[in-house]
Each structure stands twice: as structure tokens, then as C-alpha cells.
């Protein structure tokens, strides 16, 4: 996937390998993330310091890691340095050394990060929500693992994951910038065409089951003065045929400052500093959810107001003036997302990863403009959850809100200090 862009002598790349956390073994969650993070910590004949010095000396950028469904390497470099950087990319992806010292260092840092992130519930509530709403499905696996799963990982686990899941058949590379397509294609093929297939089958997660009924996950953070809440269920996949109409609905309902949800909770209600509707999509169904936070004493009021907005849009849809305003907003916001080489490369790679064509970008604003009011109402009815089928995830002072939030459904309670996965597996306290 190559695109020439000659206005500046810069090249950006995004390389993605199918896999990611969905191929972590049960009880060894976090393996993909450690594997991805270690790619640049020793590769070929260079150690971590030498790789960092090379990239820095060229004024370049190199990042590696893993997400839910894929592992990645991305970066930027000057066009004159493309041979050196392509050689480095090939080393990082094909010849990582996974030094024991770097493994132990990154593992310790990852555990510390999980602990420190719990100081701000907004950083972790999504992990709790995914693990709770997806249950036994692979999407329930937190990408970074938890304190317990990381502690039990060894360098051998990382090596096993890499050997099973990295290979030429999994690789997708997109480059955008100041180069000749023919020459760049030749250079990439010279470095990657003989990379053998990964031994393991590529991931093929099953369709997850949408939870029925109401239930509550309450994570106790005794020193909290606010309650963070996530209220939702499963949504749609990346290839949903109504995806553009759904983008319009999502933006109008909770995707901009003047959205219905933020207006009700922040502008009119004064109950929060921000509220939004989150709707990530994956190969299989993602999620749709209200996300916000409020003072402990106004927790129930804020949740009830949020639920009222959800019920209202399901019942009545979104008025034509709001739909029209939202479409104009989206059309204005879209071009700045595709200005730099890195933005373009990332967008094209993301489309290709999910089996979408480049025309998704080229036709996006015209498809937004063509979205009708009835399309928005129809997709809301199909995708947005009813009040009877909702998962509630709350992080706050359980002693002060436990009794009140019980009205939303059966409560499973954890402590913020509990490792995420083992806490959920043990169930209610």
C-alpha cells in the first residue's frame, strides 16, 4: 500500500500484523503487548540503545506495540534515509532479539503503569467494561494484561508468541511520502517477500453474544470523590453496512461538544465536565456506550439524565436541524484528519486491515452528506440499546453509592486494587 506525496521530503509508514491481544493465551494476557513493545528493544545486531540512537540521529520516529487485533510498527523518516530505515524496520519485525534485561524492564514498567493508571479511573474504566461485557470472548482480554498475568509471563512466553504469530502472511505495510512507488515496492519486497508464514492460524474471533438484561459492575475506589460510569452494550462491526449513518448518529448524540448527551449532562445539567458516546468497532461487534463522570453525590442523577437522553433518541430519533448541523460539522472536521503523511498512512493501513478500500476515505464526506434523517433514526433503533439491556460499569466510592446503584441491576463488586481478570473471575464479593 503505497502513496506518493512530494510536498516535503518525508516518508511515514504503518506496518500491521494480524494478531494482537486476541491471540494471547488465557491467563497470559499482556503477551502480545510485551512482544510488540520489545521489538525495538533489540533487533538484528543492534541493542535498544543503538536502535534509539540510530533513529534519533536521523531525526526519525519509530514506535512498536500491539492492540486488540494487531501488532504494529510505525514511524517517520526523511526520504534520503529510506534505505537505512527500511533495513531497521526489517530487523525490528523479522529479527528481534528480546533481550532478557529489556524484557524484565518492560514487564516491571507495565505493571507499574497499570497500578498508577488506577489513580485516574478514566484511564481504566474501558478495560473493566470490555472484560465485563465480552465475558469469555477474546475481546474481553485487556491488551496490556493485568498485574497478575504480567507477573507470570516469561521471556519464553514472548518468544513463543512471536514465533507463532509473526510472519509474512500476517504483514500489511503502508507507506506515504516522497518516493517513487516502483522503487519503494522493490525495496520492500527485497526485505520482506521471503518472510515465511506464521505457523499459527490468523485470528478469527467468533461473533460475541450481546448480553441480555441489566447488570452492574461496581469497582470500589474508597478515596474517590467522583464516580466514573460506562453504560452500554455490544455495537456493530467495522464493516457494518450502516456505518456512515451510524457515524452521523453517534456524533449528534455524543461525539461533539454540543451533542445531545453533553448538552444534557454538562451544558444544561452541570453534572459533569464532559460526556460522550463511545462506539469502537472491530472485526466483530465493538461496543456502544455512554461515558462520563460526576460528583459522588450526583452519581444517580447523572446516570438517570444520561439514560433519559438514550431513551429519548431511541423513541424520537434526532431532529432534522441537529442532523443537518452534525453533517456539516463532520464534513468540516474530516479533511484535517488526512493532512500529514502519518495520518494518511495510518488511515489507509487501518482500512486495509479491516478489508476496506481506499474509496472509503475518498467518498466519506459525500456519504455523510447523503445520509437522510430516516437513516439516522433507523440505525439508532437497530444499534442503540434499550433501557432493559444495559451493562453498567462504575468506578467510585462503593460505600456511598452501593445501595443507590443497585436499582440498575444485580451488582458485581470489585476493589480497584484487585487485578482486573482474577477479580472478575472470582465474581461478586
Regions found by a protein language model. Give the residues of each.
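Short, charged, amphipathic alpha-helices and their helix-cap/turn boundaries
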Residues: 150-154
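An aromatic/glycine/proline-enriched structural segment found at the starts
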Residues: 135, 139, 143, 172-237, ...
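Short, surface-exposed beta-strand/loop micro-motifs that present aromatic residues
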Residues: 1-4, 159-164, 213-221, 377-382
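Non-catalytic, conformational "gating/processing" segments within enzyme and secreted inhibitor domains
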Residues: 126-127, 155-191, 385-391
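M16 family metallopeptidases and their MPP-like homologs
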Residues: 3, 7-40, 46-94, 106-112, ...
